[in-house]
Amino acid sequence: MHQQKRQPELVEGNLPVFVFPTELIFYADDQSTHKQVLTLYNPYEFALKFKVLCTTPNKYVVVNAAGAVKPQCCVDIVIRHRDVRSCHYGVIDKFRLQVSEQSQRKALGRKEVVATLLPSAKEQQKEEEEKRIKEHLTESLFFEQSFQPENRAVSSGPSLLTVFLGVVCIAALMLPTLGDVESLVPLYLHLSVNQKLVAAYILGLITMAILRT
């Protein structure tokens, strides 16, 4: 005897549901957007029943709110916004598509679709552009702040070591030269001509370094 091939039992709520798009945006100033289409796909080897639920059903008309999808087929669900008022701008509504096997009532899977009413497509594009520019400026400021301390360190003026060397060189040049007999400075502080030339050379380098900063 041939045994009948049994389909594996599906767990409630775990079946992936394929819907496109997953977000609906209606624009008040564009009537062509007041009617939009959801497409439900059935890639499986068995037929599916579907049902469309909504958090605010009084604001929408759903054509084909319930029905069936054949195996490896799709069905279009038309959704019309019938309450286009400014008080609904920016309010997020949700549609839920539940699917089940034709022979059973339990929901095998579900998918939520977000719906939003906006005043104008142009305003939406303008807001997105302003947001993009703001993010770009924020990033620019972030990088400038990151490198600012380094710039300050470079342009903060001569270091203490440079100033100290400059003072030493000036003091060396002011000391008497070897051979000056009439000096009150002790003899061991008398410098030779070569030593003073070295001090003058170093002082010149220090002066150039200070001027560059």
Swiss-Prot record:
Annotated Gene Ontology cellular components are: endoplasmic reticulum membrane; Golgi membrane
Q: Where is the MSP domain?
A: 16-143
Query: Which cell locations does it reside in?
Result: Endoplasmic reticulum membrane; Golgi apparatus membrane
SUPFAM superfamilies on file: PapD-like
Top-level division of the source organism's lineage: Eukaryota
Residues crossing the lipid bilayer are 159-179, 191-211
Renumbered to this chain, motif Nuclear export signal spans 205-208
InterPro entries tied to this protein = Ig-like_fold, MOSPD1/3, MSP_dom, PapD-like_sf
Identify one Pfam family in the record.
Motile_Sperm
Q: Which UniProt keywords apply?
A: Endoplasmic reticulum, Golgi apparatus, Membrane, Transmembrane, Transmembrane helix
Q: Does the keyword Transcription regulation apply?
A: no
State the membrane topology: Multi-pass membrane protein
The answer to whether UniProt assigns keyword Nucleus to this entry is no
Report the PANTHER family cross-referenced here: MOTILE SPERM DOMAIN-CONTAINING PROTEIN 1 (PTHR34441:SF2)
Its annotated function is as follows:
Plays a role in differentiation and/or proliferation of mesenchymal stem cells. Proposed to be involved in epithelial-to-mesenchymal transition (EMT). However, another study suggests that it is not required for EMT or stem cell self-renewal and acts during later stages of differentiation.
Protein name as it appears in the record: Motile sperm domain-containing protein 1
Q: Which organism is it from?
A: Pongo abelii
